[in-house]
Amino acid sequence: MDINITLIGQMITFAIFVGFTMKFVWPPLRKALEERREKIAEGLASADRASRELEVAKRQSAEILREAKAKATEIVENAYVRAHKVDEQAKEEAIAAADKIKSMAIAEIEQEKVKAKEQLKQELVNLAMAAASKIIAASVDEKASKKVLEDFVEKV
């Protein structure tokens, strides 16, 4: 095995090349690899954080939705209760108005009844006076008196 100068030259050149690469090429390459590893780790951490935040947001949105549904149900129930109260109040007012009208009608009927009785009494008095004066005028004839009284009774 002959070691000649070419082989030694190649070994020296290779050693210089390795030294040059270790000094000038390897550090930026290592730095780039390290930066890439950090970016990947940061991306994974960011994705993990985003996943957790998404989970929290989902829980919060579900809670907000639940609260909104509960509030909507409460509003509907309150509206139903209020409508029922208004309905009952309207019914009570209508019944009160009907009772008032009925009472007024009954009072008016009673007044008309009293008035009619008074008129009837007045007419009865007038008829009795007329009959009495006819009886006195015709007191001579008993038959005529009887007839006048019968006519009077028929009128009444």
UniProtKB/Swiss-Prot annotation:
Subcellular localization: Cell inner membrane
Alphabetic keyword roster: ATP synthesis, Cell inner membrane, Cell membrane, CF(0), Hydrogen ion transport, Ion transport, Membrane, Transmembrane, Transmembrane helix, Transport
Record's GO cellular component terms: plasma membrane; proton-transporting ATP synthase complex
MF GO annotations: proton-transporting ATP synthase activity, rotational mechanism; proton-transporting ATPase activity, rotational mechanism
Keyword Cell inner membrane among record annotations: yes
Membrane spanning stretches: 5-27
Predominant location category: membrane
Chloroplast is among the record's keywords: no
Pfam families found in the cross-reference section: ATP-synt_B (PF00430)
Membrane protein topology class: Single-pass membrane protein
Role: F(1)F(0) ATP synthase produces ATP from ADP in the presence of a proton or sodium gradient. F-type ATPases consist of two structural domains, F(1) containing the extramembraneous catalytic core and F(0) containing the membrane proton channel, linked together by a central stalk and a peripheral stalk. During catalysis, ATP synthesis in the catalytic domain of F(1) is coupled via a rotary mechanism of the central stalk subunits to proton translocation. Component of the F(0) channel, it forms part of the peripheral stalk, linking F(1) to F(0).
Family named by the database record: Belongs to the ATPase B chain family.
Known partners and oligomeric status: F-type ATPases have 2 components, F(1) - the catalytic core - and F(0) - the membrane proton channel. F(1) has five subunits: alpha(3), beta(3), gamma(1), delta(1), epsilon(1). F(0) has three main subunits: a(1), b(2) and c(10-14). The alpha and beta chains form an alternating ring which encloses part of the gamma chain. F(1) is attached to F(0) by a central stalk formed by the gamma and epsilon chains, while a peripheral stalk is formed by the delta and b chains.
Protein name per Swiss-Prot or TrEMBL: ATP synthase subunit b
